Amino acid sequence: MGHKIHPTGLRLGITQEHRSRWYATSKMYPILLQEDDRIRRFIHKKYGAAGISDVLIARKADQLEVELKTARPGVLVGRQGSGIEELRTGIQKTIGDHSRQVRINVVEVERVDADAFLLAEYIAQQLEKRVAFRRTIRMAVQRAQRAGVLGLKIQVGGRLNGAEIARTEWTREGRVPLHTLRAEIDYATKVASTTYGVLGIKVWIFKGEVLGDEAQTMPVGASPRRRGNRRPQQFEDRSNEG
């Protein structure tokens, strides 16, 4: 009998990168891993309105680097960068080390509706507002298709529309090749808290296939070409340097 494997874990080192990039001894590894978890929980809880899709953490000696991928960078940066300093102080307080150097880099998400986590968050918000789940899924599919994704799958499970018996409903549009390792699959989960209980949301988005050693993403059926020079807008914090 077949079982579904986590799409991100299956592709680590192929089309996906690790969200925590550091090395540690066997004694320090669990401590630093728990630190990463606390940092992510703190950021998602306090800055939920900023539409943060991913938090990448890297460690170099005594320096901690945090990269935030967000749909609304202005909410994080704040006026004249005041939000960055507040975020840095909050991270230092979370890990219990105010002397640790924390460097923060905010990256704007190019296509919001093509991001699996942000799409799952949108679905959760609509379900919590008591919008019918089928209408919510249909609207989410339309938004993703307008963003130019090649395929997506959405699954919602729980007491849908307040039904007595929990069930799972899903829909798929386009191609979602979960067995193809070179396929770039963006996967995310989210929980919606409703008056009838919690609903589990899963989103798979197929963005293209990665070709060659340069990890170049190419839509299926298109001729290979290099990406343009345009880069997503970045807000890099260098106040701790020098």
From Swiss-Prot:
Disulfide bonds: none annotated. Transmembrane segments: none annotated. Pfam families: KH_2, Ribosomal_S3_C. Keywords: Ribonucleoprotein, Ribosomal protein, RNA-binding, rRNA-binding. InterPro entries: KH_dom (IPR004087), KH_dom-like_a/b (IPR015946), KH_dom_type_2 (IPR004044), KH_sf_prok-type (IPR009019), Ribosomal_S3_C_sf (IPR036419), Ribosomal_uS3_bac-typ (IPR005704), Ribosomal_uS3_C (IPR001351), Ribosomal_uS3_CS (IPR018280). Residues 217-242 are annotated as: Disordered. GO terms for cellular component: cytosolic small ribosomal subunit. Residues 39-110 form the KH type-2 domain. SMART domains: KH. GO terms for molecular function: mRNA binding; rRNA binding; structural constituent of ribosome. This is Small ribosomal subunit protein uS3. It comes from Prochlorococcus marinus (strain MIT 9313). The gene is rpsC.
